[in-house]
Curated annotation (Swiss-Prot):
Its main location: Golgi. The chain crosses the membrane at residues 7-27. Residues 1-6 are extracellular. The modification Phosphothreonine is found at T41. This is Receptor-binding cancer antigen expressed on SiSo cells. Residues 163-211 form a coiled coil. Residues 178-206 have a biased composition (Basic and acidic residues).
Length: 213
């Protein structure tokens, strides 16, 4: 039974190889036919009659042959010059306002000053009485509320007393702050000691409970 199955399998594989070979041959023959049918034959001859004719090219030396060789100006005898002068006169002068104006600077002469006489002027000197300096008179201000300025005496000890009072007040405040700080520190230390004592008591109680059990 096994031998017959092996022979049948071998026969099927042979048929499959034959069919695949035939299929490849058929595909190759079909491709060759398509390529042979798609080929395009190109013409080997060229028709020169269809090419457009080029225009005749002229040399650059012959371009100015037809140009005029002389120019005649009508209306001679200086008419052209007079027309140009009239046109120049009609044009406005744009730079007229830009011409600089030169002005002479004024000279200031300073005369040498003569020494002033601060004394009382008399007829011998040539100075005027309005230019002479007078001695300052003492100014005495009297008021009904403040009294005479000469009789007022400054109390120098008042400033020192105020400074002492301010310093004493600052010292009292500083001492009070220091006492409050020490009080808070003592309170915190007391609370810390109480917590430590409670913790030790709980620890002792736990030990006693363990021993009893």
């Amino acid at each position: 039974m096994a031998i017959t199955q092996f022979r049948l399998f071998k026969f099927c594989t042979c048929l499959a190889t034959v069919f695949s070979f035939l299929k490849r041959l058929i595909c190759r023959s079909g491709r060759g036919r398509k390529l042979s049918g798609d080929q395009i034959t190109l013409p080997t001859t060229v028709d020169y009659s269809s090419v457009p004719k080029q225009t005749d090219v002229e040399e650059w030396t012959s371009w100015d042959e037809d140009a005029p060789t002389s120019v005649k100006i009508e209306g001679g005898n200086g008419n052209v010059a007079t027309q140009q002068n009239s046109l120049e006169q009609l044009e406005p002068d744009y730079f007229k306002d830009m011409t600089p104006t030169i002005r002479k600077t004024q000279k200031i002469v300073i005369k040498k000053r003569e020494p002033l006489n601060f004394g009382i002027p008399d007829g011998s000197t040539g100075f005027s009485s309005r230019l002479a300096a007078t001695q300052d008179l003492p100014f005495i201000h009297q008021s009904s509320e403040l009294g005479d300025l000469d009789t007022w005496q400054e109390n120098t000890n008042a400033w020192e007393e105020e400074e002492d009072a301010a310093w004493q007040a600052e010292e009292v405040l500083r001492q009070q702050k220091l006492a409050d700080r020490e009080k808070r520190a003592a309170e915190q230390q007391r609370k810390k000691m109480e917590k430590e004592a409670q913790r030790l008591m709980k620890k002792e109680q736990n030990k006693i409970g363990v021993k009893l059990s």
